[in-house]
Each structure stands twice: as C-alpha cells, then as structure tokens.
Amino acid sequence: VEKQTSSSSSKDTSSTKKNTSSQETKRIGNADYGYIDIPSKWIKFTDIDGTEAVQYTDGSGYNIVTLNSFTREKAKVPADIEFNAEFLAKKLAVMWQDNQDVGKMTGARTKVSGLDAYQLQIVMKSGQYLITWIFQKGEKVYTISFEGDAETLKTFIPYIEDTWSLDGTGAVTD
C-alpha cells in the first residue's frame, strides 16, 4: 500500500471520516497506548508471544491491530542516545530488514491525528501486509500496527490516522 505524503485537502479528510463513521465502531485501547475506533465486530486478541500490547482482530486471527507505546526505559535506549519516533522507526526497520519472510519494505511520512508519523510498510512473501505507524507525543513514542490483507488494511487506515487520541471516553474493556 503506497501512502501519499502530500497533505490532503479537508474535503478528503471529511470523506474519509464519513466512511469510518458510517460503520458501527467501538473505542479500544488504554491510557498507556492511546485509543482508536475500530469496527464493533472486532474482538480482543492475545498474541502467543505474550506481548503487553492491546490487540484486536476481525475474528480471523489474520487481520490484527496492535497498540503499544515506548518510553526510553521500555525501549532500553541509553541516556546518551536521543529517543524519539525517528529512532524507534529506524530500530524497527533494522529489526525487519534481515527477516527472510519479508518481500518488500518501504517507509513513508504521514500523520496520526495531526501528529507527524513515520510509517513502516512491509509486505511479507506470503502477501500479508504489516504496516506500523510510529509517532511521538511528549516523552513517549506510540506505535500502531496493522497486519493482514490489503483490502482490510485499506478500510482500516482512517481508523488509525483519524481516531487515535489519549481520550478514552467510551472505551470498551472487553
């Protein structure tokens, strides 16, 4: 999925929001990772690697959204190295570049709720997409990842880029 890095018009933004709001949604996340709206039918998912991140799936176990965040301490970054979204994006790219299952990896710049974000776009040899948005608010770096098929990804991008915030009003606890 190629992401345009040019700024979109307000008309584009309102039509994107209209598309996501026409589907019934629920708010998921927590105070540490932030919150996003997702389709109501999506369910909580627990990864076998035991990650602390918040994860939801459409029920397939293939299409999954993951919310996480990192402080300098959690990312194990020494005090003499600048810790920010760019650092974490580069660290993730290096981690993935030697993975033999990766077919293609590219990067882009985008926005998440008005915040500058790095986007790591990976297409696995299997055809599965793994897209991660990396952005910073204050001292914390947030990541939102989507893994799954191209069609679901296309519909999911507005949920990530338009609805993320630290406001958990109405969030579900399932």
Where are these regions (language model features)?
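Surface-exposed amphipathic alpha-helical segments
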Residues: W42, V141-D174
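N-terminal "mature-domain start" segment
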Residues: K18-T51
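N-terminal Sec-dependent export signals
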Residues: V1-E24, D174
